[in-house]
From Swiss-Prot:
Name used for this protein in its record: Conserved oligomeric Golgi complex subunit 4
GO cellular component terms attached to this protein's record: Golgi membrane; Golgi transport complex
Predominant cellular place of this UniProt entry's protein: Golgi
Location in or out of the cell: Golgi apparatus membrane
Length: 801
């Protein structure tokens, strides 16, 4: 393209680019298919490159002009900027060189570290081999020393030294004996000879120790027995030593058993304790066994370790089980336990009537047997706790010194310790719960629970039959103290046995008796009703048919009703006290969490029974209120609706001085309450007061619904409401105010000036009412209350929303 055309394009204001170049350039000639003209294409690209260069120069000049126009020292700044960029570039070059040097140094260090690590590893291997060689050399030296001294020690009867030599021989590394197989005769003859000498000496020493220990057992020489028993673990025959030593201890246990059984068959040493003869025998036997174990345990524990002590106890337990079998058979025969169990089971499960059973068990005899079983279980529990404390304790984990292997093997040591602990717990469970003593005591505890249930049942039934009023001025009868005494005695006896399951079973049976027998007896008396003048005629006719004096029958029924009412409330209170006392007493005893949860759940059953009795007492008070109070309150409140509420100021002032209704009404209520207060338990009287408060509020509210008020009538109503509140608060406390809270809302609505004020009062009462027992007036009820105001327009009341 000619130069003038380029010049004209550059000077024009059109933007330069490939498209303009193509547009102003010559159109390319059409070429044939699969042919390209690269010469023309290259020329166009060069042209565009030239245009871009000139544009760059123009832009740089424009930038320089702008900088010169806007800054005084534009050129100086450019130079400063250029120098700064140059310095930065120089610094970056220095950093790059330093980084290359650092990289090279790190590579060298890495190579050196790998070299050092390899050498350290080689040194560790060498150290391990050297230590192994030194250990092997030491073992070989010890092997020779043991072989040289073993025969002399046996000949001189220095069995302690001989046992030490054998122990060292048996604990040597097996690598020492593998040297015997090498072909070098000079290196193996000495080792082979030492091995044969020590193996032969071990057999001879084992026979000697067994023979000597057997002789000392036959002679009863305790010192010799304890001397030889210590050597069996050293020659790796601990079970043999325990078996032979247990022969001596089993002989002592058998002698102890025979002595105690002889005393038992002779009737004991104290005639006053014949009723607990078998419990005393078991206690003395376990105490003697504990002394035998305690005196011999230190020697065995030091020589055999805790794990072997448990195996040793299994050997002794066979003789203990045999004694307990004989004791249990004698106890079952002499105390007729199986016979009583059958009779008691028939009575409790109502297979036969209690009177129909021949030779029915005497509750006092059952009481003695139950106490003796508890004492027997207490002795067994004490013995098991002794065994668990002395033998069941776990060994402390000992971590060997060192860092490397110990850290790696710490988890393995913990796992081995856990497995040993689990195995030991299984053995302890086998010893404590699966032995004859354990299983038979569990069977006896089951028998005890059955006997205890029978004793409580018969005792409670006897307490009901012999129920009498305590004294002339008393509110309760003897059944309250008798039932609580029986239940407390049985629960504490079960707790004294040391078996938590028996405690839970006893509490369960006791609460079942309260909920059925005691509750049913009290409910029956309450359901007969309270005799008043209104129902006296029907009661008198019933008494006449039965041939009883009418007045005496009515008075007796009234007294029985009040006694049942007060007995229910008092018994509920005493059961709560019993529950709290048991919780406090058991809180000081250390028990597993499982047993604590069982006892906690059982004590809640006592609370539930107390709540049922309290509910029965409340029901009785309600029946008393319906019979003796409700109609009289209604009759006293009926004249209230006859008072004209369209009052004047003079009427209000007159009523303030001469109240025509409220004083007489409250005096009538007070006479009713005063008559019944001495007859009721405190909780029952409080319930009666609250029922009276609710009924007064209900009757007054019903009377108000039949009246029409003006402003002065509402003022008089407010005064009367305050009188009611003051009286009820005085006799029943602040809880009575909640019972008349709804009436207070009605009085507040009637004492407003306008409908708007009434709505404000209603909304405030809704916001301020926090008690769930006070029901706020609904909107329809508010309309009905405001309609009682004769001076309020009906249209305005209906428009309330």
């Amino acid at each position: 393209m000619p130069e003038p055309i380029l010049h004209s394009k550059f000077l024009s204001g059109l933007p330069a680019g490939r498209k303009n170049g193509v547009r102003h350039g010559e159109k390319p000639e059409k070429v044939g298919e699969k042919q390209f003209d690269f010469t023309r294409k290259i020329r166009e690209l060069r042209l565009e490159l030239e245009i871009k260069k000139r544009e760059e120069e123009r832009i740089e000049k424009d930038i320089a002009i702008i900088l010169e126009e806007n800054t005084i020292d534009g050129g100086e700044q450019n130079r400063s900027f250029g120098l700064a960029v140059t310095r930065l570039n120089n610094h970056m070059l220095v950093v790059e060189n330093s980084a290359k040097q650092l990289t090279s140094a790190l590579k060298n260090i890495s190579v050196l570290a790998d070299t050092i690590s390899g050498r350290v590893s080689a040194l560790d291997v060498a150290k391990t081999r050297v230590v192994g060689c030194l250990q092997l050399a030491g073992d070989m030296r010890d092997l020779g020393v043991c072989a040289e001294g073993i025969d002399d020690a046996i000949r001189s009867e220095d069995f302690e030294t001989a046992s030490q030599h054998i122990h060292r021989f048996l604990t040597l590394d097996q690598a020492v004996f593998q040297i015997r197989e090498f072909k070098q005769k000079d290196a193996t003859d000495s080792i082979r000879h030492s091995y044969e000498v020590l193996s032969s000496a071990k057999e001879r020493l084992s026979k000697i120790l067994k023979s000597r220990l057997t002789e000392s057992v036959q002679k009863g020489d305790v010192a010799e027995m304890q001397r030889f028993i210590k050597m069996f673990p050293l020659i790796h025959e601990p079970d043999e030593g325990l078996q032979r030593y247990s022969v001596f201890l089993n002989q002592k246990i058998d002698k102890l058993a025979e002595d105690n059984l002889a005393i038992m068959k002779a009737g004991g040493t104290d005639d006053n304790r014949r009723n607990v003869l078998y419990a005393d025998t078991l206690f003395m036997f376990f105490e003697g066994v504990a002394e035998i174990i305690e005196s011999n345990l230190p020697v065995l524990e030091h020589s055999y370790g805790l794990e072997k002590l448990l195996d040793f106890m299994f050997i002794l337990q066979a003789r203990i089980d045999e004694f307990f079998r004989r004791l249990h058979e004698e106890f079952d025969t002499r105390r007729r336990l199986s016979h009583f169990n059958r009779l008691v089971d028939d009575v409790i499960h109502q297979k036969k009537a209690a009177e129909a059973v021949e030779d029915a068990p005497d509750p006092m005899e059952i009481d003695a047997i139950a106490s003796e079983i508890c004492m027997m279980n207490t002795s067994a529990e004490m013995y098991w706790r002794f065994v668990s404390r002395r033998i069941g304790k776990n060994e402390v984990i000992r971590s060997p010194s060192g860092d490397g292997d110990d850290e790696e093997n710490e988890e393995a040591r913990q796992e081995r310790h856990r497995l040993r602990k689990e195995a030991k717990e299984q053995k302890m469970d086998q010893l404590l719960n699966r032995s004859r003593v354990g299983t038979k005591m569990q069977e006896l505890i089951g028998n005890y629970c059955l006997l205890e249930h029978f004793y409580m049942l018969k005792s409670v039934q006897k307490a009901i039959k012999s129920d009498v009023k305590e004294d002339a001025g008393g509110l309760t009868s003897s059944i309250v103290d008798d039932v609580v005494f029986i239940i407390r005695k049985s629960i504490r006896r079960a707790a004294g046995s040391g078996n938590v399951d028996s405690v839970c079973a006893t509490i369960n049976n006791a609460t079942a008796l309260i909920d059925t027998v005691v509750h049913g007896h009290l409910r029956q008396s309450i359901q007969q009703g309270y005799v008043t003048s209104s129902n006296f005629a029907s009661e008198a006719f019933t008494a006449y048919q039965q041939g009883k004096p009418v007045k005496e029958a009515a008075d007796a029924q009234k007294e029985q009703f009040l006694l049942a009412l007060n007995n229910s409330a008092k018994l509920s209170e005493l059961l709560i006290e019993l529950q709290k006392g048991l919780i406090t007493e058991w809180a000081g005893v250390k028990r597993p969490d499982v047993e604590k949860n069982k006892l906690e759940h059982s004590t809640t059953q006592i609370e539930e029974s107390a709540k049922k009795l309290a509910s029965l007492a409340k029901h009785g008070v309600e029946e008393l209120f319906k019979s003796a109070f409700k109609n009289k309150i209604k009759q006293g409140a009926d004249p209230y609706q006859e008072i004209d509420r369209q009052m004047t100021m003079q009427d209000v002032e007159y009523y303030e001085a001469h109240d025509p209704f409220m004083e007489q009404f409250l005096a009538q209520i007070d006479r009713l309450l005063v008559e019944n207060e001495p007859l009721l338990f405190a909780d029952n009287y409080q319930t009666l007061l609250l029922l009276t408060s609710s009924e007064i509020a209900r009757q007054i509210e019903q009377s108000l619904a039949k009246c029409q008020f003006n402003r002065y009538g509402a003022l008089q109503l407010d005064r009367e409401y305050r009188q009611i509140c003051a009286y009820l608060t005085n006799v029943a406390g602040w809880s009575a105010r909640e019972k008349v809270g709804r009436l207070g809302q009605i009085v507040s609505l009637l004492n407003v000036e306008t409908i708007d004020e009434a709505m404000e009062v209603w909304h405030n009462s809704k916001a301020m009412t926090s008690s769930a027992t006070i029901r706020t007036l609904t909107l329809p009820e508010v309309r009905k209350v405001l309609a009682l105001r004769a001076d309020f327009p009906t249209v305005a009341i209906k428009s309330i929303e």
